[in-house]
Swiss-Prot record:
The gene is GNB2. GO terms for cellular component: cytoplasm; cytosol; extracellular exosome; extracellular space; focal adhesion; heterotrimeric G-protein complex; lysosomal membrane; membrane. G proteins are composed of 3 units, alpha, beta and gamma. In this context, interacts with GNAI2 and GNG2. Interacts with ARHGEF18 and RASD2. Interacts with ATXN10. Interacts with SCN8A. Guanine nucleotide-binding proteins (G proteins) are involved as a modulator or transducer in various transmembrane signaling systems. The beta and gamma chains are required for the GTPase activity, for replacement of GDP by GTP, and for G protein-effector interaction. This is Guanine nucleotide-binding protein G(I)/G(S)/G(T) subunit beta-2. WD repeats lie at residues 53-83, 95-125, 141-170, 182-212, 224-254, 268-298, 310-340. It holds the Pfam family WD40_Gbeta.
């Protein structure tokens, strides 16, 4: 047996030991704890608005903190800021690269960001004196595509990339201030903790890592998925997060228990998950799928509580407003839909 093969086996044994040690610490299961909870019942949501204007596949969307405006990014080379109440376009921003994969709205509402196969995170200022939108900063540095970006504030943004790393940037100087390396596959998604001090990243190595924003340290690594992880989202209290994967499952992981608590899957669901989000209370988990649907899960019990059907192609992105009053789904059919 080669030395490398021996090391592989040892690593596998250690992994199993760690898994067993984690299991031994678990004094109870989520299923046992939530047995007394009333089921949420059947959740039915209606399409309240359809946002028409993109001319090609929509790849990403993100709500503003006002729960009214949202930004979407499409393969048509446009970033559109929408008013979800009126369905009007507030801004339509032509991009230098049409190969956009992610977009983000700053908490202040002053900036939006996007990026994709150009490997660059572009920041756009929405509140210029002239009233027009312009590029305020471009952040080059990743050696792979930009898969996700999220603002910490008007001067800091975190990006994830196909180069297997994440990065924290100082927007003012255009410099990377912290690099986060540790994944062995493309990083597909990131989610900021509610307090903004940590974030989780999901990658094509089928693992999720928890990072400290300030010091580039990987605090925890979570395994269990059997394929690429496309989406991650923090639970509203910041102590847990959910993931969506090409293995056709969503999973709930707890930071304090240091392990997986629950898996959301169904025999009829055999396609990958593109996007995940929690309701404001955390009781419902919404997940977008390759089969054109968005499933609603009872996050505590693991049962399917409803389905949002209305798109004619893959649901590529979704988001719940900060006030919890609406859900937006974006699809390869070029439309965004607002539900509640």
């Amino acid at each position: 047996m080669s030395e490398l093969e021996q090391l592989r086996q040892e690593a596998e044994q250690l992994r199993n030991q760690i898994r067993d040690a984690r299991k031994a610490c678990g004094d109870s299961t989520l299923t046992q704890i939530t047995a007394g909870l009333d089921p949420v019942g059947r959740i039915q949501m209606r399409t309240r608005r359809t946002l028409r204007g993109h001319l090609a596949k929509i790849y990403a969307m993100h709500w503003g903190t006002d729960s009214r405006l949202l930004v979407s990014a499409s393969q048509d080379g446009k970033l559109i800021i929408w008013d979800s109440y009126t369905t009007n376009k507030v801004h339509a921003i032509p991009l230098r690269s049409s190969w956009v994969m992610t977009c983000a709205y700053a908490p202040s509402g002053n900036f939006v960001a996007c990026g994709g196969l150009d490997n660059i995170c572009s920041i756009y200022s929405l509140k210029t004196r002239e009233g027009n939108v312009r590029v305020s900063r471009e952040l080059p540095g990743h050696t792979g595509y930009l898969s996700c970006c999220r603002f910490l504030d008007d001067n800091q943004i975190i990006t994830s990339s196909g180069d297997t790393t994440c990065a924290l940037w100082d927007i003012e100087t255009g410099q990377q201030t912290v690099g986060f390396a540790g994944h062995s596959g493309d990083v597909m998604s990131l989610s900021l903790a509610p307090d903004g001090r940590t974030f989780v990243s999901g990658a094509c190595d089928a693992s999720i890592k928890l990072w400290d924003v300030r010091d580039s340290m990987c605090r925890q690594t979570f395994i269990g998925h059997e394929s690429d992880i496309n989406a991650v989202a923090f639970f509203p209290n910041g102590y847990a997060f959910t993931t969506g994967s090409d293995d056709a499952t969503c999973r709930l992981f707890d930071l304090r228990a240091d392990q997986e608590l629950l898996m959301y899957s169904h025999d009829n669901i055999i396609c990958g998950i593109t996007s995940v989000a929690f309701s404001r209370s955390g009781r419902l988990l919404l997940a977008g799928y390759d089969d054109f649907n968005c499933n609603i899960w009872d996050a505590m019990k693991g049962d399917r509580a409803g389905v949002l059907a209305g798109h004619d192609n893959r649901v590529s992105c979704l988001g719940v407003t900060d006030d919890g009053m609406a859900v937006a789904t974006g699809s390869w059919d070029s439309f965004l839909k607002i539900w509640n």
